[in-house]
């Protein structure tokens, strides 16, 4: 059996939960949920009671699919107004025969000494590099020999009050938060590879009411910007122009419109309800023109924000978020950014939708964090893990992924 992790992303429109199992360095999705949310705006808690009720409902659905109750989560938190700084830490190596995960942890803890956390709380501490005895530089020093281990670390923080409201609401919902990371961190780990780990790039996540732009240097976030525009603005445009209900506007956007109007069919029609006595047909071309105009504006604003955040050469741009699933979205991205940009492509069975990028990636981040420190953490008890197994005397199954395959439904 592999290590099992649960990630949760509290969005304005929906709560996403993804449960993964790591087996032989591969991550398999055991359960995924996208459930309507209330009391949450841009990842922040506005009404803890309403938010808790929504979270409980999502947790019940995820637990039902998993077959055991979820009691521990890794939580995505919004990077809006986050602060980042580079700090230094060091430690004497415990055993000269080889650096251990404990030495790594001690060096990272030392880097936090003397930092002012009066108003802000630590979210992540991402090591840039480790130096052994002032000479050897590496990203993972475990097993190497030396007497002094030093590290350069990017620490990120967010305002305490906002973070504590998120943690308190999750606790009220019946789960323990074992770790936190920014949604942008989850997005990066969802697409992380050796190539991106050596480059400077940007990730654009188009959310419900805001768009987040994150700059990464060799796999570590160094800058962040947030725009007050998102997917809901597309809905509002459709509602205004065609006098459609908000729910119908969203449905047209997701299931009818093209992101690039050139690919729309002028003969394809969609019937909307104006009032109880009046219905109206709208053409795909007309709806797509409205959608394209707003999405193009969001992409242009994001491009300008990238320039404002850094003057470094951007070697890759990844666009994610639910809006990036629009038909033809990749063609619009190519027009605005060129070949340096592409749409996030999550191919894992069970989460083939970009709305899951943050909470899927955060489980990979947590596992990576543990591996560097040579630690393990059980989010599900041994008894619960055993209860998840489906006994089949005729077929040998290597992972829980196979055993809970039947829990998947319309999330693919």
Please give the residue ranges for each predicted region.
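Nucleotide/phosphate-binding catalytic cleft detector across ATP-hydrolyzing
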Residues: 1-14, 18-73, 77-202, 245-246, ...
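Residue-level signature of catalytic and energy-coupling elements of molecular machines
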Residues: 17, 75, 170, 205, ...
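Phosphate/pyrophosphate-binding loops at sites that engage ATP/ADP/AMP, CoA/4′-phosphopantetheine
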Residues: 58-71, 299, 303-316
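Glycine-rich phosphate-binding loops at beta-strand->alpha-helix junctions
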Residues: 78, 158, 258-260, 314-333
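Short, surface-exposed connector motifs at secondary-structure boundaries
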Residues: 148-150, 217-221, 309-316
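Acidic, glycine-rich loop-and-beta core segments that form the ion-binding/anion-interacting portion
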Residues: 194-261, 265
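ATP-binding/phosphotransfer module of carbohydrate and carboxylate kinases, centering on a glycine-rich
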Residues: 303-317, 326-342, 372
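Glycine-rich phosphate-binding/hydrolytic loop that grips phosphoryl groups
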Residues: 345-389
């Amino acid at each position: 059996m592999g290590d099992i992790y649960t990630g949760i992303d509290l969005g304005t429109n929906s709560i996403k939960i993804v449960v993964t199992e790591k087996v032989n360095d591969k991550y398999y999705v055991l359960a995924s949920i996208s459930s309507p949310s209330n009391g949450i705006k841009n990842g922040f808690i506005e009404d803890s009671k309403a938010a808790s009720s929504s979270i409980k409902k999502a947790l019940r659905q995820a637990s039902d699919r998993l077959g055991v109750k979820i009691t521990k989560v890794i939580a995505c938190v919004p990077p809006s107004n986050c602060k980042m700084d580079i700090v230094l830490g060091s430690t004497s190596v415990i055993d000269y025969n080889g650096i251990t995960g404990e030495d790594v942890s001690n060096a990272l803890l030392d880097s936090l000494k003397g930092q002012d956390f009066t108003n802000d709380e630590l979210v992540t501490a991402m090591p840039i590099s480790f130096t052994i005895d002032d000479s050897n530089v590496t990203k993972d020093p475990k097993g190497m020999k030396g007497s002094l281990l030093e590290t350069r670390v990017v620490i990120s923080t967010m305002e305490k009050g906002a973070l504590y409201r998120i943690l308190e609401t999750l606790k009220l919902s019946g789960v323990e938060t074992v770790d936190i990371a920014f949604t942008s961190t989850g997005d990066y780990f969802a697409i992380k590879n050796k190539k991106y780990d050596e480059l400077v790039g940007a990730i654009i996540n188009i959310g419900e009411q805001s768009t987040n732009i994150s700059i990464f240097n060799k796999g570590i976030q160094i800058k962040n910007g947030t725009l007050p525009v998102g997917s809901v603005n597309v809905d509002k445009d459709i509602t205004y122009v065609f006098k459609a209900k908000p729910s119908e506007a969203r449905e047209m956007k997701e299931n009818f419109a093209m992101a690039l109007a050139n690919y729309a069919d002028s003969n394809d029609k969609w019937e909307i309800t104006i009032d109880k006595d009046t219905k109206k047909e709208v053409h795909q071309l007309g709806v797509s023109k409205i959608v394209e105009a707003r999405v193009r504006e969001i992409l242009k604003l994001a491009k300008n924000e990238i320039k404002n955040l850094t003057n470094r050469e951007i070697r890759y741009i990844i666009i994610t978020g639910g809006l990036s699933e629009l038909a033809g979205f990749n063609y619009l991205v190519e027009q605005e950014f060129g070949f340096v940009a592409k749409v996030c492509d999550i191919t894992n069975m069970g989460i083939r939708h970009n709305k899951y990028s943050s909470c899927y990636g955060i489980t990979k981040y947590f596992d990576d964090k543990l591996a560097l420190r040579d630690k393990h953490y059980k989010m599900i008890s041994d008894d619960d893990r055993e209860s998840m197994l489906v006994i089949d005397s005729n077929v040998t199954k290597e992972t829980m992924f196979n055993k809970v395959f039947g829990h998947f439904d319309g999330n693919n």
